[in-house]
Each structure stands twice: as structure tokens, then as C-alpha cells.
């Protein structure tokens, strides 16, 4: 699983500490929902309860900071992945000039050159050969997505 960056961890710690008013080292499940919603995470009460139950490893009914981070990471990382997918979908749509659901390997070559101008023709050939396994000369969105997100 991916990890949170320093900025995200710092924001989570501040939120956790501000709701842990008695400095007991834990927060209630209700508070978790409030914090997640403040951070822009949309989650139903039912899903929240389910995730809290999975994350509350010691069964205390409260979440310690480590448990809270584990829970929040699931949503924050998932949100980042969704944003990446949306951006890639938009980029693909722009390059799919015919609107037929695929781009040619020539177009892919242009995209890769724009992303990294240090790539040699051999590098580009290697990447395209790897991505265009069937040799069709085209890539659909799923293949493009897989290549761009590793």
C-alpha cells in the first residue's frame, strides 16, 4: 500500500490532536467522521462504521493515532488515485482526436517526448514495444492508464 506524505501526516496529526482535547491518545468514531469530512472525504455513515471496525485493531471502540492514520490513508490515497485517473482520462480524450477510444503509438511517442525530452528513440521504441504487446499500433484507455500509472 502507498503511504501518506509528510504534509498529509502533519494535517492528520493536527486534526487528531485538536479533537483529542483531553490528550488521552484516542478519538471517538464520530470524531473520525468529522475529521474525514473536513478533509473533503465523502463517506456514508455505514461505510465509516465498517472501516472503523476493521481499523480498530484493539477493539477499544476508539481510534489511537496510528489506527486513525491507517484509516485516513485508505481514503486519501484512494482519492489521489481517482484524481490521477481523471487527469489521465482527460489527457487521453484530448489525444484521442477521432474519439474512437484509442490513440496510435505515434501519438503515444509524442506524449512521452513531451513528458521527458531526454528519452532517446531507442527508449521510446522499447516503451512502445512493451505497451503495444499485440503490435496493433494502438492503445486503448486501459493500456494507456496502466502505462502511465505503473
Curated annotation (Swiss-Prot):
UniProt GO molecular function: calcium ion binding
Record carries keyword Repeat: yes
Cellular component GO terms, alphabetical: myosin II complex
Keyword Secreted: no
Domain EF-hand residue range list: 7-42, 43-78, 83-118, 119-150
Family from the record: Belongs to the troponin C family.
Binding site for Ca(2+) 2: 132, 134, 136, 138, 143
Binding locations of Ca(2+) 1: 56, 58, 60, 62, 67
Modified residues (N-acetylmethionine): 1
Protein name: Troponin C, isotype gamma
UniProt miscellaneous comment: There are two different troponin C in crayfish. This protein binds two calcium ions.
A Pfam match: EF-hand_7
